[in-house]
A protein has these predicted regions:
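Short connector loops at helix/strand junctions that flank enzyme active sites
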Residues: 11, 39-44, 88-92
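A short coil-to-beta-strand element that immediately follows conserved catalytic motifs
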Residues: 70-78
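NUDIX/MutT-family hydrolases
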Residues: 96, 105-138
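Conserved Nudix-box catalytic region and its N-terminal flanking loop in Nudix hydrolases
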Residues: 24-61, 65
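Charged phosphate-binding loop/patch that engages nucleotide di/tri-phosphates or the phosphate backbone
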Residues: 132-153
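Conserved N-terminal beta-strand and adjoining loop/helix that marks the start
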Residues: 2-26
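Active-site-adjacent beta-strand/loop module that shapes the phosphate/pyrophosphate-binding cleft
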Residues: 20-22, 80-104, 137
Length: 153
């Protein structure tokens, strides 16, 4: 028999490791405002799953709101239950996807700036919350796509 818990349900967050047409990871610099968690840190695209919404629905909505891109193809990576190391306890649904665009073809609607990141550049990045560890997990299982260097920037 299931017992009712006095604990509030964990907030749900859907995020995507989004790669550009050269297979570089697209990340954005969070605003530098003292009233937001992890100001001036680099972040993945995505956000909160709203009531009645699936994680996939939230992912599509958030990427459209933040980057103006309609995600049509994505893959699930992992679920993380984050009880520490973040602004509040949450469940993160992590996906990965690719957009066939160069960074300069994209418009960032939230945050300070957009960046495309190579595998080797990640060590110098200050990621928000537990995202650095999530990225390392993604790399460890061999999912970072091979670079495509024969395309114009």
């Amino acid at each position: 028999m299931m017992q009712k818990s006095d604990q509030p349900a964990l907030k749900q967050i859907a995020m995507v490791l989004l790669f550009d047409r050269r297979n570089r990871l697209l990340i954005y610099l969070r605003d530098d405002k003292p009233d937001i968690p992890f100001p001036n840190h680099w972040d993945f695209f995505g956000g909160h799953v709203e009531e009645g919404e699936t994680p996939e629905g939230a992912l599509i909505r958030e990427v459209k709101e933040e980057l103006g891109v309609e995600l049509v193809d994505w893959r699930f990576f992992r679920t993380y239950v984050c009880t520490e190391g973040d602004a509040y306890p949450n469940v993160k649904y992590i996906y990965w996807a690719k957009v066939e665009k160069a960074p300069q073809e994209l418009v960032l609607y939230e945050g300070q700036t957009l960046r495309s990141l190579t595998l080797d550049e990640r060590a110098n990045i200050r990621f928000a919350n537990v995202l650095g560890a999530i990225l390392e997990d993604f790399i460890a299982v061999g999912l970072w796509p091979r670079p495509v260097d024969n395309l114009p920037s």
